[in-house]
């Protein structure tokens, strides 16, 4: 006899973390898209640190298939309830060989049970807008409420880096020196973006500790002593985006006072040229599907829609 068991913990143990990572890698190979975003992977990485994320209302859900031979970890979900204004968000991934066997549905049920009556509805991401996820969403009556596009372009014909606007100096990020200034401007630039705008100095330093971090690809635009904007690039050494390394416009942000003067495009082009000069052949970026002005800007810069992530509401 077999069944599904769901465990809910604040901090998964080391063995489960390793298995969850392997599960996510198997899903990425099968689907061609990473099932878990960077923030969840950082939570998993810090799970052994009792002091990390102490003020974060986050939970890990581990699904196991039970049989007379033992148990096998076949699914995982992450629930973040920290943002009271936006409501809880979740990520779900199921081992490819265990799909269409009730694991995804069991995880959704467990997520629902973790939210108190009166809380805002849970919103669940589907990365890559996969048919299996859409079928489960339709079966459970989930409604799509947000769509995030992945856009890409080749880097072969990127022009030289442009001259900055008058009064602007562009320099690379100095770890330990520019941290606080960047966090302050990032918060203002993304005041209405719950994930990006809430980043703390510790969140920044967590990313600086990752193997992919390169300050030479992190560009800051200064107006005198004041930070006006930034373009942080990233390189995926191996990923679902291609056989070789792929660049990313990781995040571009401007102080609100600097918007509308072309600085965002300048910073974007500086970063694209940097990725080109590193010998990369392609670059991607993420943009809200309903952000028509941003989509128009990126389209003019040669980007086209490659795939989409869809958020469903439970």
Curated annotation (Swiss-Prot):
A GO term for molecular function: mycothiol synthase activity
Keyword Nuclease attributed: no
Swiss-Prot/TrEMBL keywords: Acyltransferase, Repeat, Transferase
Top-level class of the enzyme under EC nomenclature: transferase
Residues noted as binding 1D-myo-inositol 2-(L-cysteinylamino)-2-deoxy-alpha-D-glucopyranoside in the record, renumbered to the chain: 38, 195, 234, 248, 286
Pfam families linked: Acetyltransf_1
Purpose: Catalyzes the transfer of acetyl from acetyl-CoA to desacetylmycothiol (Cys-GlcN-Ins) to form mycothiol.
UniProt protein name: Mycothiol acetyltransferase
Species whose genome carries this gene: Catenulispora acidiphila (strain DSM 44928 / JCM 14897 / NBRC 102108 / NRRL B-24433 / ID139908)
Lineage, top ranks: Bacteria, Bacillati, Actinomycetota, Actinomycetes, Catenulisporales
